[in-house]
Amino acid sequence: MIRQEKDIKDEIMYGEREIEAGSLICFPNPNINRDYEISIDFPEFTCKCPFSGYPDFATLKIKYQPNTKVIELKAIKLYLNSFREKKISHEEVTNKIIDDFVEVSDPKWMQLEADFNPRGNVHTIIRVCHGKRNNLELSL
């Protein structure tokens, strides 16, 4: 069977279905007796400006020290992609993301940095934190 271009345009794609059905899920921390830090970069975050409707692009940097749960990476990807068509301010989306991550995983400490691409010659970086960071001797 040959699919026509119109059929493809009207069809909900598998990625869209996964994003729509996705939810933040966690798994047990495999090293609960050790303090360690997880860093995740998400360089292709998008949402829409609630005032203009234009797309906003950002790099998200998530760092956290897990408590009893670790957030599953594919779930993070699908969750963050769900903002692609939402009209939401930089400040609101950054705070919503960390609130949702904290609610599902209850980390010891978490920081989210949202580095939005400049628009109109204005560059916005928003940082939000939760909890108290344990001092780790990390060097690479």
Swiss-Prot record:
> Recorded GO terms, molecular function?
preQ1 synthase activity
Main location class: cytoplasm
Q: Does the keyword Membrane apply?
A: no
Which key words are in the record?
Answer: Cytoplasm, NADP, Oxidoreductase, Queuosine biosynthesis
Which Enzyme Commission number(s) are on file for it? 1.7.1.13
Q: Please name the catalytic residues of this protein.
A: 49, 56
What start-end ranges are recorded for coiled-coil regions in this protein? Answer: none
GO cellular component terms attached to this protein's record: cytoplasm
Return the InterPro entries for the record.
GTP-CH-I_C/QueF, NADPH_dep_7-cyano-7-deazaG_red, QueF, QueF_type1
Which residues are listed for substrate binding in this entry? 71-73, 90-91
Q: Which SUPFAM superfamilies match?
A: Tetrahydrobiopterin biosynthesis enzymes-like
What processes in GO biological process is this protein linked to? Answer: queuosine biosynthetic process; tRNA modification
Catalytic activity from the UniProt record: 7-aminomethyl-7-carbaguanine + 2 NADP(+) = 7-cyano-7-deazaguanine + 2 NADPH + 3 H(+)
Q: Which pathway does it operate in?
A: tRNA modification; tRNA-queuosine biosynthesis
Query: Where does it localize?
Result: Cytoplasm
Q: Does the keyword Phosphoprotein apply?
A: no
Concerning PANTHER family, the annotation shows: NADPH-DEPENDENT 7-CYANO-7-DEAZAGUANINE REDUCTASE (PTHR34354:SF1)
> What is the purpose of this protein?
Catalyzes the NADPH-dependent reduction of 7-cyano-7-deazaguanine (preQ0) to 7-aminomethyl-7-deazaguanine (preQ1).
For this chain, the family text in UniProt reads:
Belongs to the GTP cyclohydrolase I family. QueF type 1 subfamily.
Q: What is this protein called?
A: NADPH-dependent 7-cyano-7-deazaguanine reductase
Source organism of this protein record? Prochlorococcus marinus (strain NATL2A)
